[in-house]
C-alpha cells in the first residue's frame, strides 16, 4: 500500500490553476453579459437581497466538469490513502471564497495483503483451478491498467485461510439459505458461492456465517449486470467477464462507521472497544469474483446436490448461455480461500467547507459527496465529486457578485464512505448535538451519473421542493424538464415491475399524493402510484445520508442519474466508459449540478424553508398501510409463543388503529403549519419588509416559528432508545432493513417485532411510536 500512496503525487496548486480558470463556454459568455446588468446581473428582492436562481443556472460548465472528473478518477484513492486529493479539495474551496478545513478521524480499517481462491482435490492435493482475481486490461482505457489498482478484496472482511466443499446459495439471502435447508442441503463447514444482488453484500456474509459456512465467495452474474442486460464493456456499458465488484462487507444494518467507536467519533485519542466486541463485523473470510472466475466453480457443482432450478427459477443465472448448469452442490472437490488482510488504525480526511449565512449563520444546509473509491470510481463517486467542485465554483462566482446565502451552507467531501459510511458517520457522531439543533437538511449526491434515469431516495418532506426544482432544469437528452423525464421513467419502471439491485421493495415507493387529500387521513383504495406524480424511494442505507437521517434526525435526500451498474466498484468504472456510453457531452453532470445547487440555494436562501410537513404526514399514512401488509404476511406464518395467534392479530389491529389516529393528528397539525405559511404570505409577505416595527417583529416571529417547525419535524421521529438489537438506528419510521442492508424498512422496530413473533415487544414499541407521532403533531402546533 506504500507504493499506492507514493504513486499519488498530484501537484495541488498547479492543478487548481489548470482546472479552475474561467473557460469561455456559452455559459460563461452569458455570465459575462450578466455583469453589465445592474452591475451584477442579479435581481434583488423587496428586502434588497440578491436572487441568485437564474444566474446560477447559467454557471455550470461541462468543460470544467470533465476536468474535475478526470482529476478525481486519477490515482489510487482508497480510503486513507490519498491525502493529496483532500488537500486539493480544501485548496479549491478556499480559492473560491469558501472557508474550509480538513477534519481527520482515525477508524480501524483493513487493507489487502494476499488473496487466493483455488479449487482442488483434497485427497491428491491436485489444483484443478486457481482464480485469477484479476481484471483484463482494456485497450484505450488507461485506468484499466493502472498498477496501483486495488486487488479483489472486501473492506472489513475477516482475515482467514479456510477450506471446504462448495455450495451454491443463489443471492445469499436469508430466504435462499432457508430454501437450501428445506432441500436438505447443509452449508455447515462449507464454502458458499453466491451472486451479487437483492441484499447488501455484508448481509450475505452474515447469513452464510449464521448457517455455519467457513467462507464465502461473491460473484457478479451476467444475468444481473453483464451480457444478460446488453453489450459488455468495452462494447457496451455492462459488466465485462473479468470485472470484479469490490465493496465493504460490514454489517451496515447494525451500525455504520468505525467498528471500534460505536456511537461516538473516532478521534485519535478516543477509547476503542476490543475488535472481538464489534457487532458490525463478520467473522468468516470473503472474496469477490468475476463471473469468469466463478464459471469453473459452478461447473464443479454440476450433478451434485439439487438442480438450482428445482429451488426456483430465480436460482438460475446468465452463465447458462455458456453451457453452465446451476446446481447447489456440495461439490466433490474442495475450495480454499486465503484472505490475508492487515487491520490498523488509519487517518482519514473529511474536507468541510463553510459559506457563512448573512442573516442566520447558526442554521445550516449541508451538502455532501464522498471522495474515496475502490478503483478509479468515475461514476462512484467522482461524478459526484465533480458536481460538488462545480457547485463550489458556482457559489464562489455568486459571492463575487455580492450574494451570500441567508443561512449557512456546509460543503462536505467525505472520506471512507466505501468501507461503511465511515467519514460521514464519524463527523455526525462528532457534531451530533449541533446537528440536532441547527441542521436544516442534508443533500447527498453519491454517484451523480451512472445512467440516464433520475433517481431519488428521500424523506417525504422534500417532495414539493424536488418537484419545483426539477421543473426548472432541462433534461439534456429530450429537452423536457427533468421532472417530466423523472415522471415518465419512474412510472415506466413501476409498470414493468423493475426493482433496483439490493432492494426487495419492502420500503416501497412513494405515491406522491400530497395534492389529492382532504386531510382526513383515510386510507385510499389502492397503493398504486398516481399517474401525475414521480416516485421516490424511502431512505435505507448505503450512502452518506444514513447517519444524518437515521441517527441524528436531519431530513435527508439523495439524488442522482442512475441505471447502469455494469462497472460498479470495478477497474472499468472509468471516465472512458462513462463518457463513451453514459454521458458523452457531460450534460447529465451539468443537469445534476443545477438540481443540487437549486435545492441548496432554496433551502439556504428562501425566507421560508420549502420543506413540506403535509407531504410527510400523508406519506406516514402509506407507511401504516405498508406495516399492515407486513403484519398480515407474517401473522399466520409466525408462531406466537407468548400469546395465541388470534390474540396477536387483535393486538396488531388495535395498535394500527392508534397509529392511524396519531397520523391524522399529525396531518391536521401539518395543515396548520401550511395555513401559517399562507397567512404569512398574504398578510406580511415572506420578506417581512414593512415600515411598522411592530408588524416587522410580528412577521419575523411568525416566519421563524414556521421555519423551526418545518425543519424540526424530522427530529421528533427519533427515539433515543433506538431499534432493539441495533440501537444506533433511532428513526422510528425508516431504517435499513435488518436483512436488506440497502433497502428501507418501514416502521423498522415494529416490523421486526412482528417478524420475530414477539407480540409483547410489539405492544410496547407501538405504544412508544404512537406517542412519538403525537409529540411531533404537538410540536407542529407550537407558534
Language-model regions, residue ranges each:
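Noncatalytic luminal/extracellular "stalk/propeptide" segments of secretory-pathway proteins
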Residues: 32-55, 67-188, 222, 237-256
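Metal-dependent peptidase/peptidase-like ectodomains
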Residues: 245-305, 360, 416-574, 579, ...
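Second-shell loop/turn segments in exported
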Residues: 51-59, 73-82, 152-157, 191-198, ...
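Soluble metallo-hydrolase cores and metallopeptidase-like ectodomains found primarily
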Residues: 148-179, 256-378, 393, 397-401, ...
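Alpha-helical metal-binding/catalytic segments enriched in His/Glu/Asp
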Residues: 351, 367-421, 426, 596
Amino acid at each position: 500500500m506504500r507504493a499506492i500512496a507514493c504513486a499519488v503525487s498530484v501537484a495541488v496548486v498547479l492543478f487548481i490553476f489548470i482546472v479552475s480558470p474561467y473557460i469561455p463556454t456559452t455559459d460563461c459568455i452569458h455570465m459575462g453579459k450578466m455583469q453589465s446588468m445592474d452591475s451584477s446581473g442579479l435581481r434583488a428582492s423587496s428586502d434588497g437581497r440578491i436572487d441568485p436562481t437564474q444566474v446560477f443556472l447559467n454557471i455550470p460548465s461541462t468543460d470544467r466538469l470533465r476536468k474535475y472528473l478526470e482529476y478525481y478518477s486519477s490515482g489510487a484513492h482508497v480510503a486513507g490513502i490519498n491525502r493529496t486529493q483532500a488537500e486539493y479539495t480544501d485548496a479549491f474551496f478556499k480559492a473560491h471564497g469558501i472557508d474550509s478545513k480538513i477534519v481527520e478521524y482515525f477508524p480501524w480499517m483493513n487493507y489487502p495483503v494476499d488473496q487466493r481462491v483455488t479449487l482442488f482435490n483434497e485427497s491428491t492435493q491436485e489444483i484443478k483451478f486457481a482464480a485469477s482475481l484479476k481484471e483484463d486490461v482494456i485497450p484505450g482505457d488507461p485506468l484499466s491498467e493502472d498498477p496501483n489498482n486495488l486487488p479483489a478484496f472486501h473492506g472489513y472482511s475477516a482475515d482467514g485461510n479456510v477450506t471446504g466443499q462448495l455450495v451454491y446459495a443463489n443471492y445469499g439471502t436469508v430466504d435462499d439459505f432457508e430454501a437450501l435447508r428445506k432441500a436438505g442441503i447443509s452449508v455447515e463447514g462449507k464454502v458458499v458461492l453466491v451472486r451479487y444482488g437483492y441484499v447488501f453484500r455484508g448481509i450475505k456474509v452474515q447469513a452464510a456465517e449464521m448457517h455455519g459456512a467457513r467462507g464465502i465467495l461473491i460473484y457478479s452474474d451476467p444475468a444481473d449486470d453483464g451480457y444478460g442486460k446488453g453489450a459488455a464493456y468495452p462494447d457496451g456499458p455492462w459488466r465485462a467477464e473479468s470485472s470484479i465488484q469490490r465493496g465493504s462487507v460490514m454489517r451496515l444494518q447494525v451500525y455504520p462507521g468505525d467498528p471500534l467507536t460505536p456511537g461516538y467519533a473516532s478521534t485519535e485519542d478516543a477509547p476503542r472497544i476490543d475488535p472481538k466486541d464489534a457487532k458490525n463485523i463478520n467473522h468468516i473470510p470473503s472474496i469477490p469474483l468475476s463471473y469468469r472466475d466463478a464459471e469453473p466453480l459452478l461447473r464443479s457443482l454440476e450433478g451434485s446436490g439439487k438442480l438450482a432450478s428445482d429451488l426456483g427459477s430465480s436460482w438460475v443465472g446468465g452463465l447458462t448461455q455458456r453451457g453452465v448448469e446451476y446446481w447447489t452442490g456440495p461439490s466433490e472437490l474442495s475450495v480454499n480461500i486465503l484472505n490475508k488482510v492487515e487491520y490498523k488504525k488509519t487517518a482519514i480526511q473529511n474536507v468541510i467547507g463553510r459559506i457563512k449565512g448573512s442573516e442566520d449563520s447558526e442554521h445550516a444546509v449541508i451538502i455532501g459527496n464522498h471522495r474515496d473509491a475502490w478503483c478509479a470510481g468515475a461514476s462512484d463517486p467522482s461524478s459526484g465529486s465533480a458536481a460538488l467542485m462545480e457547485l463550489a465554483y458556482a457559489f464562489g462566482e455568486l459571492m463575487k457578485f455580492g450574494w451570500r446565502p441567508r443561512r449557512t451552507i456546509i460543503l462536505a467531501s467525505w472520506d471512507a464512505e466505501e468501507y461503511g459510511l465511515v467519514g460521514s458517520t464519524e463527523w455526525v457522531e462528532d457534531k451530533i448535538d449541533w446537528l440536532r439543533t441547527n441542521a436544516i437538511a442534508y443533500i447527498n449526491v453519491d454517484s451523480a451519473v451512472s445512467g440516464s434515469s433520475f433517481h431519488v431516495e428521500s424523506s417525504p418532506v422534500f417532495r414539493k421542493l424536488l418537484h419545483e426544482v426539477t421543473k426548472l432544469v432541462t433534461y439534456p437528452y429530450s429537452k423536457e424538464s427533468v421532472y417530466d423525464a423523472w415522471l415518465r421513467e419512474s412510472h415506466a419502471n413501476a409498470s414493468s415491475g423493475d426493482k433496483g439491485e439490493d432492494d426487495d421493495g419492502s420500503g416501497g415507493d412513494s405515491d406522491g399524493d400530497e395534492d389529492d387529500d382532504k386531510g382526513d387521513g383515510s386510507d385510499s383504495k389502492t397503493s398504486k402510484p398516481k399517474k401525475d406524480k414521480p416516485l421516490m424511494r424511502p431512505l435505507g442505507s448505503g450512502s452518506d445520508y444514513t447517519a444524518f437521517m437515521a441517527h441524528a434526525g436531519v431530513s435527508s435526500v439523495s439524488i442522482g442519474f442512475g441505471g447502469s451498474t455494469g462497472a460498479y466498484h470495478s477497474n472499468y468504472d472509468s471516465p472512458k466508459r462513462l463518457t463513451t456510453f453514459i454521458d458523452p457531452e457531460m450534460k447529465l453532470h451539468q443537469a445534476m449540478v443545477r438540481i443540487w445547487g437549486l435545492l441548496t440555494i432554496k433551502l439556504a436562501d428562501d425566507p421560508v424553508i420549502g420543506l413540506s410537513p403535509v407531504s410527510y404526514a400523508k406519506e406516514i399514512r402509506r407507511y401504516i398501510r405498508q406495516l399492515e401488509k407486513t403484519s398480515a404476511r407474517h401473522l399466520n406464518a409466525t408462531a406466537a409463543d407468548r400469546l395465541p395467534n388470534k390474540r396477536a392479530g387483535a393486538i396488531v389491529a388495535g395498535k394500527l388503529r392508534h397509529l392511524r389516529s396519531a397520523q391524522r393528528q399529525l396531518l391536521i397539525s401539518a395543515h396548520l403549519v401550511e395555513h401559517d405559511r399562507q397567512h404569512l404570505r398574504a398578510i406580511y409577505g415572506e420578506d417581512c419588509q414593512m415600515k411598522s416595527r411592530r408588524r416587522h417583529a410580528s412577521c419575523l416571529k411568525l416566519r421563524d416559528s414556521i421555519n423551526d417547525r418545518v425543519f424540526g419535524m424530522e427530529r421528533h421521529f427519533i427515539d433515543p432508545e433506538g431499534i432493539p438489537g441495533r440501537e444506533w438506528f433511532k428513526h422510528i419510521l425508516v431504517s435499513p432493513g435488518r436483512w436488506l442492508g440497502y433497502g428501507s424498512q418501514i416502521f423498522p422496530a415494529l416490523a421486526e417485532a412482528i417478524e420475530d413473533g414477539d407480540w409483547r415487544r410489539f405492544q410496547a414499541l407501538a405504544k412508544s411510536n404512537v406517542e412519538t407521532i403525537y409529540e411531533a403533531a404537538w410540536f407542529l402546533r407550537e407558534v
